[in-house]
């Protein structure tokens, strides 16, 4: 299944994508939230659709898409998880996953604008594969970690490099501004992705290809990440793990290049859809 959410900010409704159409699932009576995943929501939704899908109203594709999941308890990001990205950042390849949090208030829809923060000079892009947790996970082993995964999303881990690297490194500070976590368009359930470790991911700025790689280049794979993180915190249903970005970010270019007011970002991952975001100065929206 491909889950989506749609509607004006603060009044989003649940839906699905089916055969190229967006369908309103409001009649199901639940949003795609922690409670939904916690209570076997995907299985219940699939069963409900068997007898109700023909009744669902089609959504006009001019409608705003929101994040495909309701605000989760956590957005956990993994740093330097592609070897060439570590090299372009001038940092050694990590021996264990580098973890940091991204404020959930940064979450937004896949076509919402990127807001360049006040006093920002180095707002950057990062295409990433995001993993959505399907059930509570604590101290789990790598061998069964995939049992805890609900599905996958496309994520732009927007970053402000000056904020991030200031005073020796404050990653959460450089990752958590408003609209710094465009997610979606869809949550694609794991049964639809045959091999999440062989997906092309790419990103363009103003039509120019900046990132073009494959998840086969991940330093730490998804089972390793899910298991590792669960040793240090409880993962709740709906939590997002963003698995890192490949090379081609603005920071690594010579000279570096960053987003300016009016720039357009387009990104995609095989099977997960395409997103587009336009950058705006914070005080010009």
Describe each PLM feature range.
Residues 5, 9-10, 46-50, 57-64, ...:
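Catalytic-pocket segment enriched in acidic/His residues
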Residues 1-97, 266:
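N-terminal non-catalytic cap/leader segment that marks the start of a structured domain
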Residues 113-119, 135-140, 166-170, 184-190:
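Glycine-rich, charged/polar anion/phosphate-binding loops
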Residues 20-21, 105, 208, 272:
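Well-ordered beta-strand scaffold positions
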Residues 138-152:
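N-terminal accessory regions of nucleic-acid-interacting proteins
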Residues 102-104, 111, 118, 125-129, ...:
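Short, structured patches in soluble enzyme cores that scaffold and shape functional sites
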Residues 92-110, 123-125, 260-271:
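Structural signature of FAD isoalloxazine-binding scaffolds in flavoprotein oxidoreductases
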């Amino acid at each position: 299944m491909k889950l989506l959410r749609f509607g004006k900010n603060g009044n989003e409704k649940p839906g699905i994508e089916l055969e190229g159409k967006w369908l309103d699932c409001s009649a199901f009576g639940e949003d795609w939230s922690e409670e939904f995943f916690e209570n076997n929501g995907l299985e219940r939704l699939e069963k409900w659709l068997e007898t109700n899908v023909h009744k669902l109203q089609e959504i006009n594709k001019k409608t705003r898409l929101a994040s495909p999941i309701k605000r989760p308890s956590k957005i956990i990001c993994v740093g330097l998880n592609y070897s060439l990205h570590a090299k372009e950042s001038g940092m050694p390849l990590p021996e264990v996953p580098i973890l940091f949090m991204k404020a959930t208030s940064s979450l937004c829809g896949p076509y919402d604008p990127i807001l360049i923060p006040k006093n920002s000079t180095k707002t950057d892009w990062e295409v990433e594969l995001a993993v959505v947790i399907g059930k509570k996970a604590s101290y789990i082993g790598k061998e069964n970690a995939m049992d805890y995964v609900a599905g996958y999303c496309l994520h732009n881990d927007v970053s402000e490099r000056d904020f991030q690297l200031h005073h020796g490194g404050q990653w959460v500070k450089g990752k958590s501004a408003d609209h710094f976590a465009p997610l979606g368009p869809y949550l694609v359930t794991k049964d639809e992705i045959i091999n999440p470790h062989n997906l092309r991911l790419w990103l363009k700025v103003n039509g120019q290809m900046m990132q073009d790689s494959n998840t086969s280049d991940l330093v730490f794979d998804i089972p390793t990440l899910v298991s590792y993180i669960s040793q240090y915190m409880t993962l709740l249903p709906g939590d997002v793990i963003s698995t890192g970005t490949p090379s081609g970010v603005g920071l690594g270019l010579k000279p570096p290049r960053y987003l300016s007011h009016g720039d357009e970002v387009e990104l995609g991952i095989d099977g997960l859809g395409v997103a587009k975001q336009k950058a705006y100065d914070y005080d010009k929206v």
